[in-house]
Amino acid sequence: MSTTQERAAAQKRHSVGRSVLDTVDERFGSSKFLTSVLDKIFPDHWSFMVGEIAMDSLIVLIITGVYLTFFYTPSGQDVVYAPAAGHIYYPLFGQHMSAAYESVINLSFNVRFGMVMRQTHHWAALIFLAAVIFHMCRIFFTGAFRKPREINWIIGLTLWITVMLEGFTGYSLPDDLLSGTGLRVIYSVVEGIPFVGTWLAYDVWGGRFPGDPFIARLFIIHEFLFPAIIVGLLTFHLMILWRQKHTDFPGPGKTETNIKGSRIWPQYAMKATGLAMLVFGVSFGLGGLIQINPVWIYGPYRPYTVSAGAQPDWYLGWLDGALRLMPHWEFRSFGHEIANPFFPGVLIPGLVFTIMYAWPWIDKKIYNDYRAHNLLDRPRDKPFRTGVGVAAIIFFTVLTFATATDLLANDFHVGFERLIEILQYGVIIGPIAGFLIAYKACQALQRGHSHPIQRPIGGIIIRTADGAYHTLGDHADGHGADHAHAGDTPTGNGHAVPESPAVVGAPVSPAGEAGGERSGGDAGAGDGGTAAEGRSGGPE
């Protein structure tokens, strides 16, 4: 075929492809939608990528979870471990165990990539929880939950709770000694709920613990119910985020009515793709190189073999720690004794999550601020909120340490009862001390480093014979120093021109322009620069 014929054929194919795309565009308006998607602006601050880490980890969880589902047997039926072929783990040979535990042993030793996939799934779950918690901490300390984003805070908090429950159901499925111990603790907590606990535990477990149908029910919850809730909440969360646009940290050219950063294509897409590859590599690297949850060492669950050293994954440690630190008190109500595990296992988590759900409205009352906000706070500018956050972190940390009291007492040769007593005082005194220290530290930082936008521009800059610049009178930085303000450009009239009006408090034009950036619409700086995007509505 000649070059002319090849060119004609290529043009024909291009024409047919273009015709198909035009037909689709005429019916769905796809080109306009894609243009708006590709022009979406994302902030450049690194902390906004933590949410991306969570979503990338979720993808790893879905991939590995689907693989594991093919080889797992969700049954509590009693079997004898005696594989006819393949690798045999002889310490368990001939022992009675559940069919679920046997399938996990075979998955680990006889299924190709089974061990890597199972451990990667576990590591990805830990990374996912860590990213979600860090993401929520950023939102709390910077005030990103304020109007108009209260609903997204509620969705995010519900997502966190659901993910914790999903993680617990996941590591309970192997039915090994460690997971069985955790399920027995949860059974006791549910059974301790006043008036309805006994019937509720009986119905959920399908009889007395462990309950024959419970593993099958747990499998359905872990594989279908919770994943559907997580995907639904995450989709709703992203839809609201897309509609309301991102918050952003204050800075030059940033206002309540615009957002500056990188366009989704190509800058943000390339950055997100690189981060996703990193998360995938780290997850599978950990799964292939670092052992986690070796269920074959723990053995099958038997109540009489439970021993010290049984701790849940770190994200649930605070709940187990609360159970361990609860004093041996007795409470009676309406002639009935309330079981001790009810208070640390149900009441305390209920109060904690209730306060967290209500926090956007509590914060409004504290600061008497009912306006909409798109710019984030610096933690130092909100001492009370920052103090509460630090107190909460200390509270959860002390409870998490309490889940390892048996190990700590053995390793550091401290009396177990004495260690419990120390942590009981610590869970009360620690948060109070943390709040006071954080509150005072924020106030000190405010006094020592006032925000540039609050400083008046004053003084006259003169040039000496040796070419140096000096400031006469009041200086803009408030220290009375006799030198030019850093970053200012001198002019011939003896006054300094601020490098960025938005930084040092120069007036902003009515159109919302600051530092030469547009506050409305899309303003790009090319593929290699930053862009600004207008919001649908300003603060009220």
Protein language model features and the residues they cover:
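Membrane-embedded alpha-helical bundles that constitute the cytochrome b-like, heme-associated redox core
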Residues: 2-325, 343-540
